[in-house]
Amino acid sequence: MTIWVDADACPKMIKDILFRAAIRTNTNLILVANSYLTYPNSPFIRSVLVEKGYDRADHYITSHMKAKDLVITADIPLAAEVIVKQGLAMSPRGELFTANNIKQRLTLRDINEQLRSAGERTGGPSALSAREKTNFANALDRWLAKSK
């Protein structure tokens, strides 16, 4: 079992939670990014540097992940592909993406994309709140407990 992180856009506070959890539970954690990252020296944590380019990190993750692995991402199309491959996808806000909710999330994403293309301002995600940070940590702990 491995935790994969779409690391370029993952907030630092979420990566810090992941680092502590990986070390505490001896769980493999792989950060995939197109820029260099700093992370604790641990046999359970490593990073993969992919070429800069559209969806390079996503393709790497989906090519190397296995069923039941956890992928941390805010990227809805990546989450959908993870679910197809029998993995679990979780947002940095602690939201689990499932077969039951991913189609709705993809549709909403596509609508927002069309609005942006038409010149509408849809705004980006709000800053991560303390409650969302706690939600993420709790969801991660539940997954780790089930997976061991």
Swiss-Prot record:
Coiled-coil blocks: none
Pfam families assigned: DUF188
CDD domains the record matches: PIN_YqxD-like (cd18720)
NCBIfam families: PRK00124.1
Family the entry assigns: Belongs to the UPF0178 family.
This protein's name: UPF0178 protein lpp0103
Organism, as annotated: Legionella pneumophila (strain Paris)
